[in-house]
Amino acid sequence: MKEQQHIFTNKMLRTLLIPVIFEQVLNSLMGTVDTMMVSNVGSAAISAVSLVDSINVLVIQAFSALAAGGAILCSQYIGQKNHEMANKSARQVLFIIIAISVAVTALCLLFRVPLLKLIFGKVESDVMTASQVYFFYTALSFPFIALYDAGASIFRSQGNTRGPMTVSVISNVINIGGNAALIWGFNMGVAGAAIATLASRVFCAVVVLWQLRMDRQPIVVRNYRQIRPDGKMIRRVLALGIPSGIENSMFQLGKLAIQSSVSTLGTVAIAAQAMTNILENLNGIAAIGVGIGLMTVVGQCLGAGRKDEAVYYIKKLSVLAEIIVVASCLLVFVLTIPVTKLGGMESESARMCFHMISWITVVKPIVWTLAFIPAYGLRAAGDVKFSMITSCITMWTFRFCLCVYLIRFRGFGPMAVWIGMFTDWTVRGIVFSLRFHSRKWLKHKVV
């Protein structure tokens, strides 16, 4: 098949993927900058940010999954050239997101102290105090990051990834500048980091909602106050979003459960694991950008009735993602020691971090891509329940149980987390590869 016969040319793919990859890297850097700047305040601060962010990511991933469910509908309607239904889908995504995010924020603010104590148990008192402060401000940002996720997903479903990228660039400037002023200038510690993040997320939400009003795109959303619930469309969005939301939430709940075991190892181990999580995220985030772009590509291909194209692009972009993972792992490995020194980590925490990153650099390029990238394409085809079931089983069986066993019964340190992770990745990769080659995922009808 020649390139001109494909729905997406290589140039179109570059235009789609480069901004979304760049955006994902920038979003990841926001959390990295928070942690590195706070790390100079002390181990208690970096531990607090790490612990609370594990809750924040759980909530934000659930919002992202709901937004992605709507984006699947939008992209398939765009592929069909049915812009009216794409617009209706977009309006309902925004309605669902704002309703749920406001409710979640209210619950988190009301119960933040017992929630933190329930999840993290007997952490050191200074860590718990800093965690309560950080969680208060970041919980306030949930509706804003949720609205941004919804708006950005709607833009990506149309193939417009440059707009969200531009917003992310400015948002990161706001976050970094706010961190510098509030953490170092006003000595506000974790509160300063959280307030800077809140400000950047408010900016993101306002700008993306304003951009959705423009006439230059297939999907245009105005009169936000006049959006009313459409039961049928909401059910369709939720049918795609809830399984992905459960999958993402179970994934993050597993991380929280694992974090409870890691928290028993002491502040040095918590700090080492926190920095390792950040660095591991950095060496995979660009490839995740490819996966997010793949959802748009597969959705539009299937909306246009081109199943052969969907298969072709999953293969093609999986190869691209693997190249990115290899390069990213090598880069992060080289930068690990300088980053731990720049972050002011204690020597023992830095040593443990480097040991874990060394193993990640070896294992991740072998198994990670097949475990995650094809799944984005399968979800865009509507195969969300299979992805949810597979991910939940492998995560709880291998990642969680193995990790807890190694820490609590075999005396392992934080490396146990990554042994469980590697096992999970390997099994996921095998299962999703078999599912992809079976072609059963192509039998779903989304629109």
Task: List where the protein language model places each region.
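N-terminal transmembrane alpha-helices
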Residues: 4-36, 40-41, 57-69, 73, ...
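Short alpha-helical transmembrane segments in multi-pass integral membrane proteins
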Residues: 1-20, 74-141, 185-242, 298-364, ...
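Residue-level hotspots within the lipid-embedded alpha helices of multi-pass solute transporters
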Residues: 24-28, 61, 101, 105, ...
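Transmembrane helical elements of multi-pass membrane transporters/channels
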Residues: 15-34, 137, 171, 200-204, ...
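Small-residue-rich hydrophobic transmembrane alpha-helices
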Residues: 46-106, 145-164, 270-336, 368-392
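Small-residue hotspots at the loop-to-helix junctions and early N-terminal turns
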Residues: 43-54, 131, 135, 194, ...
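Short runs within selected transmembrane alpha-helices of multi-pass transporters and secretion channels
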Residues: 67, 137-156, 164-172, 193-208, ...
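Helix-terminus/linker motif at the lipid-water interface of multi-pass membrane proteins
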Residues: 25, 29-47, 116-125, 181-188, ...
